[in-house]
Structure formats: structure tokens, C-alpha cells
A protein has these predicted regions:
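Solvent-exposed, low-complexity, repeat-rich "mucin-like" stalks and linkers
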Residues: 1, 48-99, 177-204
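Extracellular interdomain linker/stem segments of modular secreted and single-pass surface proteins
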Residues: 43-51, 168-176
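A short beta-strand micro-motif common to beta-rich folds, especially ectodomain repeats
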Residues: 11, 18-32, 132-134, 138, ...
Length: 204
């Protein structure tokens, strides 16, 4: 901008998501004035944070497989942990802590594979927030008729945390006999057959 005489300058900036403040210098050049005049503009940092993109809950298919959970942070390091859940039996059809997951040793932080709990290469969060993702593999299929749950917690270097519930849909009801035909002796002695089922049943 340019002008003449007295003026008021309005300073604005883009949203800053980095963990450290940033600065710039404004230089004024005026006719007949030497040296040039400057002032510094300081933009405050965003407090250290971490969040999951899906909020407080995400889901995995009843068939199992792979689940990737994403989020954002500006921390120097992130530490993930699976929480121990105890099923109190109060919610019918749900088994708290019944979903078996294996915590990966590494996750993706801003495109770089990073060891859980270790400093992130290049510290991208100093200048801007970054996207992270953690992928769970080989999740078993749900062979029960109950919803299964697990919980993942992530912590920043500064102690900020986020937690997300992971729910696996109930499996399909199943019922079958181990043998399609059994043979009783003439004496009528007992012969067994096995029922393989995950749901309530009756015989007639």
C-alpha cells in the first residue's frame, strides 16, 4: 500500500496453526527520509493440541480387516495407547473391551513414518498443524451377535489428550449341527450331536 501523510495501518494474517509464534517485518520507505523505518508483526502460536477427525467414535466392519484412524496435531511427538475396558454388562448386546486390536509400532505423521512416542522428524508442528494416521491390521471378524468395542488414546508431549471409541458391528447369527445324520443303536443308547451356534435356539 502507499499513501501520504498520517494513516492507520490494519494488520491481518492467515490462521496460524503452528505451536510456535511467527514474525514478519513491515518496511516503510518515505520520500526524503533515511534510513527506512520498520516494525515487527508477531502472530501468536496455537496452543499444542491433538484431535481425531472422526471425533469421539469410529467403526470397523463386522468382517474385520483394516482400520485407519486419522487426526491432526501440532505436537513434537504423539503417544498412542489402547485402553483397558471392563464390560459391566449394563448394555445389552455390547461387549465393552471385546474388540481385539494390536497397537502398531509406527504411525504416519505428516507423511513420515514415526515410531510411537518418539519425536517427529523435522518437527512440522512448530510451524503448522499436520495430519496423522494410525492403521490397525488383521482385525478379526466378529463371530458373535454382540457389538464389540475398544478405545484408543493419544497424548501430546505437553499432556493434551484425545480419545476415540472403536466399535465393531455385531456378527451374523449362526446355527448348525455338527452331523447331518446320527444313528441310534437298537438298544436306544445315547448318541450325541453338537450344536455350533452364537445365538439362542430351541429344538423340537
Amino acid at each position: 500500500m502507499s499513501g501520504q501523510g498520517n494513516a492507520t495501518i490494519t494488520n491481518t494474517g492467515e490462521v496460524h496453526t503452528g505451536r510456535e509464534q511467527r514474525t514478519t517485518t513491515v518496511t516503510g520507505v518515505a520520500t526524503g527520509v533515511s534510513p527506512n523505518k520498520t516494525y515487527q508483526v508477531v502472530q501468536k502460536a496455537k496452543p499444542e493440541f491433538v484431535s481425531f477427525d472422526d471425533g469421539a467414535e469410529t467403526s470397523v466392519a463386522k468382517t474385520g480387516g483394516t482400520l485407519t484412524i486419522t487426526g491432526k496435531s501440532n505436537s513434537t511427538a504423539l503417544t498412542f495407547e489402547l485402553l483397558d475396558l471392563t464390560d459391566d454388562g449394563e448394555t445389552s448386546g455390547v461387549v465393552e473391551g471385546g474388540l481385539t486390536l494390536t497397537l502398531p509400532e509406527k504411525y504416519d505423521a505428516g507423511g513420515a513414518q514415526t515410531t510411537n512416542g518418539q519425536p517427529i522428524t523435522g518437527d512440522p508442528g512448530a510451524s503448522a498443524e499436520f495430519t496423522f494416521s494410525i492403521t490397525f491390521t488383521n482385525i478379526p471378524a466378529n463371530t458373535t451377535i454382540n457389538e464389540l468395542t475398544a478405545a484408543l488414546k493419544v497424548s501430546t508431549t505437553g499432556g493434551q489428550t484425545a480419545q476415540i471409541s472403536i466399535k465393531q458391528s455385531a456378527g451374523d447369527p449362526s446355527f448348525e449341527f455338527s452331523e447331518g445324520t446320527i444313528t441310534l443303536e437298537a438298544s436306544g443308547a445315547a448318541v450325541t450331536n453338537q450344536i455350533i451356534s452364537n445365538t439362542a435356539w430351541t429344538l423340537s
